[in-house]
Amino acid sequence: MSPERFAVKLRALRKRRKMTQATLAKKAGVSRAYLSRLEMGLHDPPLSRLRKLAKALRVAVAELLS
């Protein structure tokens, strides 16, 4: 999946959960700035971060990547 498509998916899942970037970042153990860059499609996160984001969003990693 391209970083741009991942960005759209991540933002949509975060908003569906009614979470701010700051809230999701804290739950996932990443900085808000890093999360912002992910949502802009500027980074391609490693699997370890995908797992943390998925857990914080209460979804499977596969859903983040679909």
Predicted regions and their residues:
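A detector for short, charged/polar N-terminal pre-domain segments
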Residues: 1-5
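Short alpha-helical elements of helix-turn-helix
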Residues: 6-8, 32, 47-50
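Short basic helix-loop element that most often maps to the first helix and adjoining turn
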Residues: 8-27, 52
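Conserved hydrophobic/aromatic packing and binding residues within compact polymer-binding modules
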Residues: 10, 24-25, 35-38, 64
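Conserved amphipathic alpha-helical interaction elements at protein-protein interfaces in regulatory
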Residues: 12, 16, 44, 56-59
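DNA major-groove recognition helix of helix-turn-helix/homeodomain DNA-binding modules
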Residues: 29, 48-63
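Recognition helix of helix-turn-helix/homeodomain-like DNA-binding domains
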Residues: 30-44
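Short, conserved catalytic or interaction motifs in soluble domains
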Residues: 40, 59, 66
